[in-house]
Amino acid sequence: CRQRRHQPDGVFPKNMFSLDVGIDLGTSSPLVYIKGMGIILAEPSVVAIQASTKKPLAVGSEAKRMLGRTPGSIVAIRPMKDGVIADFEVTQKMLEYFIKKARSLARTLPWSKIRVVVSVPSGITEVEKRAVVESAEQAGADKTFLIDEPMAAAIGAGLPVTEPGGSMIIDIGGGTTEVAVISLGGIVVCISERTAGDKMDEAIVQHIKRKYNLLIGERTAEAIKIKIGSADELSEEKRMEIKGRDLVAGLPRTVTITSEEIRA
């Protein structure tokens, strides 16, 4: 990655007639922040649409509950993949939902300008960056700024990013893992790998299928990762009871798994 400079103490220029919104457009769980109000929305990156018209029916938590349960006429999809836009049109609909929500909560003047800063993986291409900007602006943003995710994560973690000493940040998201060294307000070096939390969930699904002949969904896999997953050995190993569909009998079945096998 090339070295880039940011203005961490003031991403937006001061303007009293604007609504300043920050969006972490994550692969699995976007966050929406309003200046002066804090985080106002944290929902899954899922949109339920009418298959024939692509008309959005639900966004976020409501749409995620439809995953795997929708009739053929309704499709619940993730418009982001590996940290970048996989479906431009649906991402735009999701951003429209975020921006409308921000405007309604902030109760801004009708003519107030909406300025949005979006965090993006440091390794994406100029074409992918342009897709993010165009999606945000077509969704209603008057001005869109981009910031690299490692820099945004470092600022959020309170690291001294403007000082001459180096600070390392490891940001594991749903679609990308990024490791960066930051100094003097810029990213000195970074590595972006499109392997992260979603790949872990997929690995858990495959493990349960191979070992127990049991099919589980992505929500169950994510719950396993969060509840009993670990990188190092635990002083006391954990156990968890899960339910799935037996691949032979086709009936629901319950098994107990351990943190040790998930870690392995």
Report the location of each language-model feature.
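Nucleotide/phosphate-binding catalytic cleft detector across ATP-hydrolyzing
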Residues: 1-172, 180-264
